[in-house]
């Protein structure tokens, strides 16, 4: 029971992942052909009204069907398509092929080239990797090495957002990242301490393209500690604190807003009971900018050109309820609130998701 409690608590506290979106381990079933279905129907209404970011609504769905072939116990090949549509457009806003080859060292460690497992599964913090990328940029392309265990999670990847050819007039865009979490051995019967470390490098440039913009490279890091105590007899109920330090740097020292170095701190109280979680926190930053982050936390305006509010102070709160059904379907309701103490404005976001994921065996190719 103690072993089960530790394992469950680690995943409940650290992941927030959809059961439907987790990567299935199927490489042990050699010479089989599978159909993998991944679907997310979403509504996210951002009621923002401040100089940094204006309100907008994301509503739509994506469908990502894939055919997976397992030629060997450790090798799998996947081919499919990612289809993204926003409601009211009457069309697909994004249609892209997905293809990957994966080598599995074990049931918890793999190396992949091609389409990665999904942007939300990096388990990154919202201020430097916007959780809305789950809707807008789910299917990343590049290479990835991931390993996880009872006490740790490590995801190292490189994703290519924009490829350039000789003579192009645009920049190549790529992101390299590391997401690491470690659950310390218990120092008290009811106390659990986790240490997260996250790193992102975002590059805009390229040598063979003829573009007007300058080469830019940004480094964002997050390091913190999360401590929780058992809040009841249930192994998936906890309460605790989390403190995370963020830094943002322009490695090329040429940020368009003259912000070449910034920092932030996020201090939160949290509570978890089964499928529900509640957080209350305080965010303070100085010249903080993350290219892929949620602009609600940023010092740089996404709304008005050249506007920078160097010092930001926010009181934050969130509620999340996730209801799974038979490990293939999940319903999620989430609320996020932000009160800017300097601007004296309250902004909020409401999210509704229904996510479906299913792996279906369609044929056995093994010779009899």
Model regions and ranges:
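Short, glycine/acidic-rich beta->alpha junctions
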Residues: 59, 91-93, 137, 172, ...
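Flexible, solvent-exposed loop segments that connect beta-strands
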Residues: 48-52, 126-127, 295-303
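Surface-exposed coil loops of outer-membrane beta-barrel proteins
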Residues: 110-181
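Exposed, low-structure sequence patches enriched in small/polar residues
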Residues: 60, 80, 98, 149-157, ...
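Sec-dependent N-terminal signal peptides
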Residues: 2-17
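Beta-barrel outer-membrane channel/assembly domains of diderm bacteria
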Residues: 19-104, 349-354, 365-367
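Short acidic/His/Gly/Ser-rich catalytic and metal-binding motifs that mark active-site loops
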Residues: 44-45, 120-124, 206
